[in-house]
Amino acid sequence: MQVLPPSATGGPSRLFILRPVATTLLMVAILLAGIIGYRFLPVSALPEVDYPTIQVVTLYPGASPDVVTSAITAPLERQFGQMSGLKQMASQSAGGASVVTLQFQLTLPLDVAEQEVQAAINAATNLLPDDLPNPPVYSKVNPADPPIMTLAVTSSALPMTQVEDMVETRVAQRISQVTGVGLVTLSGGQRPAVRVKLNAQALASLGIDSETVRTAITSANVNSAKGSFDGPERAVTLSANDQMKSADEYRNLIIAYKNGAPVRLGDVATVEQGAENAWLGAWANKQPAIVMNVQRQPGANIITTAETIQKLLPQLTESLPKSVQVKVLTDRTTNISASVNDTQFELMLAIALVVMIIYLFLRNIPATIIPAVAVPLSLVGTFAVMVFLDFSINNLTLMALTIATGFVVDDAIVVIENISRYIEKGEKPLAAALKGAGEIGFTIISLTFSLIAVLIPLLFMGDIVGRLFREFAVTLAVAILISAVVSLTLTPMMCARMLSHESLRKQNRFSRASERVINRVIARYGQLLKRVLNHPWLTLGVALGTLALTVLLWIFIPKGFFPVQDNGIIQGTLQAPQSVSFASMAERQRAVADVILKDPAVESLTSFVGVDGTNPSLNSARLQINLKPLDDRDDRVQTVIARLQEAASRVPGATLYLQPIQDLTIDTQVSRTQYQFTLQANSLEALSTWVPKLIARLQTLPQLADVSSDWQDNGLVAYVNVDRASASRLGISMSDVDNALYNAFGQRLISTIYTQANQYRVVLEHNTTATPGLAALDGIRLASSDGGMVPLSAIAKVEQRFGPLTINHLDQFPSTTISFNVPDGYSLGDAVDAITQAEADLAFPAEITTQFQGSTLAFQAALGSTLWLILASVVAMYIVLGVLYESFIHPITILSTLPTAGVGALLALLIAGAELDVIAIIGIILLIGIVKKNAIMMIDFALAAEREQGMTPREAIYQACLLRFRPILMTTLAALLGALPLMLSTGVGAELRRPLGIGMVGGLLVSQVLTLFTTPVIYLLFDRLGHAVRRRLPAREEEA
């Protein structure tokens, strides 16, 4: 048994060193808890930070944008505007559709928001049109959030109406029931219906108006209760043939009698099985299809939801005929899983590199095993806490663990190096462990809490960015805390059992060679340090110059919000002139699809034309382009987008806007491009004056690309100007006119066919094949009070005007959204500055208000809080260090190292052509924590040497620098190699990881060189300052 000297107290580590079994079992418990926790952690791309968002869709076929706005959107908005917790309300009123998107505060639970929305819809019901085919339908989904999965259903044998019916009843409903699914939409509009196409001439010749036909159909097709009777012995339920379910039945329906002879519907109309909406269409790789888009609820886990759907699909497709093919075209989880797997590989690579650098410096296998055990134990133990906090395995938490690899090994290295030093001096391993751990314990605590203090401000960041990085900060802090516990318990215990004087002295050729190199480096460093200490003011000038350069770089470096990721999916909008027809738009879509599918990087394409809850106008088409896997294509997504836009520009009469789909979605509206800027006014007239001026100005700016607006006020309008006096004299009301027009041209849903599985509509319209366009209005006849038929032209004149295709509101006021991209060579910060200057130059009137939206607004908020965040980190660290050192001055000495980290990170980002975005800023904040560790290790030993050995401050700091040079170099290289895999990342999601790695590697390289010289100089200067202050204070007291 080793006899312990009295000084070998061991501090907080003593109990764990002396009880190896208990220590081992405690560490095994941490390891098992982490392994079990890992199995329960969900996988996702990013932390769940969605705003609670609900979309309310109301369809009113045939209604103009003005009617939809006044009759549907406005009543709903008035009710929604009274809800508590509402953050923003945006609406879009188009021909036949109203879409209101409600975004609530982050703190409001989605279920509570849902209850408020339902209550508001109920309150607005009495204010909505009586002939509304369906009440407003809400979905817990963000319309700007791209689908997690897109499926294409095609058939070479069956009509699309029959395919849609099967998909809707057998597939879509079941998928909608999956936990996490917010909305399943079927694009293509081929829902079955009975279409009644009236022959205007036949009606006129028989003296029948369309309202008579409509009334006859609705009266003939009913599905209501008929009662029952209860006899003495039997109960009987009443039923009747009150339902008509096929086109043949409707064709034979008698609608009137003329001259005693029946007039059947087939005599005055073409009756056929068709689609409910003839102006909707979808294609998959140019083949007609039903495109099924699955969107998740805000907050739902993408991976879990998609995996459940994938398991369910085989069962669902078995119920479909063999001629119906279901193909998954888009599954976002594929790229998310690939990105997470790449990050996990980089984490393992970081661990391997860190262990390699430890062996390089320690040159001893037992000594290398000790920190090699500490690293995975600290990381795996973190998983247990992550489960408790409802975190997930995502890119940010894995990045935190990758960076933590370099952090957590630092504590173990410092402990091992100090214990090894005493063993090499001849101490027994147990005594050396107690003495070395006791001596270094305060340093470990200082390092740990000062590093965690850097992360504290991240926990208090507000809004979406704060939620995003909370998991990152907490995961890293937990790993660091577990590392400190391991370093003060397991590490010294293992040193006492595994290290010995003989093992440390046992060296091979490589060990001796590396030892000579390191000794030479230390000797050379000592010589340079002496020269630097002899020229303190010059060194101080270098430090101040570094600070000034950091400020300049911060001002001029390009700034962004969040890295643009290559997820292999491109979202597109095809825009055509505002008066384009459905047939013409479909043709242009096919021409653009031909161009897109010829690109070697494209794997598949889905497209959609028509107006529904996802597409606001007939002159726009939605496209989703799936690229080949990253390993199978030569170009990144931005290069592919530029190439596709160039090729599509040769298609006449259409403009293609493209943007890559991102994992982080902050917007609430589907936009043509990545960034949005909104104008809001009290009236549409004010917007119509200023929007064109601003668009014209922005399109000239080099900082912007693909500038467009959703302001569309040049749609063709046939204005029916009724002579009310003439109409009244003939007994014709405005209601009669509206009904006649609606019956003819509104694809009016006049009756419902009920079946056991679904409900189908009867659609009424005029057959305009023979008389297309405005000429069809000549066939409209209205019944007068004397029973005669009056042509519309007798009481009205038709004027051709221009009107809006869509009317947009933001928080109940008219608005328009300007969309833009940022071209190569410019940053989002440049674009924001350019737009702000253009707005100032135009000098908008007071009634026009402007605001950036979505990620651009988040960028402004993040940029405004960044300096405060860094300042808060510095202040938090100063407070912690001041408390630990019981000094006002020593924390300043430690914090003087920070500018060296900033200048290195900013220079590295500038050289790499990367922007200063929120990921890079997190890297700079972490550098603050890493770089100050060098100063802490120097100052701790210098203070101890002054206090215990009576050295002068110069001798003490000089000796501390030489003694701590090896662990400082080891810990810095460990942190650098931990960040290196992130910097060199090339796989899926690399865009997200590289800014963090670039900033940290650059900052560590520069700070490592500078702090080794600036810290001792500043330490001595502050020491002289402290002595001068202390000399003056007694003198003043004597004078007093």
UniProtKB/Swiss-Prot annotation:
Membrane topology annotation: Multi-pass membrane protein
GO cellular component terms, A-Z: plasma membrane
Domain of life: Bacteria
Keywords: Cell inner membrane, Cell membrane, Membrane, Transmembrane, Transmembrane helix, Transport
A molecular function (GO) term: xenobiotic transmembrane transporter activity
InterPro entries in UniProt: AcrB_DN_DC_subdom, Acrflvin-R, Multidrug-R_MdtB
Residues spanning the membrane: 16-36, 347-367, 369-389, 396-416, 440-460, 472-492, 537-557, 863-883, 888-908, 911-931, 968-988, 998-1018
Subcellular location: Cell inner membrane
NCBIfam families: PRK10503.1, RND_permease_2
PANTHER family: MULTIDRUG RESISTANCE PROTEIN MDTB, PTHR32063
Family: Belongs to the resistance-nodulation-cell division (RND) (TC 2.A.6) family. MdtB subfamily.
Assembly notes: Part of a tripartite efflux system composed of MdtA, MdtB and MdtC. MdtB forms a heteromultimer with MdtC.
UniProt protein name: Multidrug resistance protein MdtB
Gene responsible for this protein: mdtB
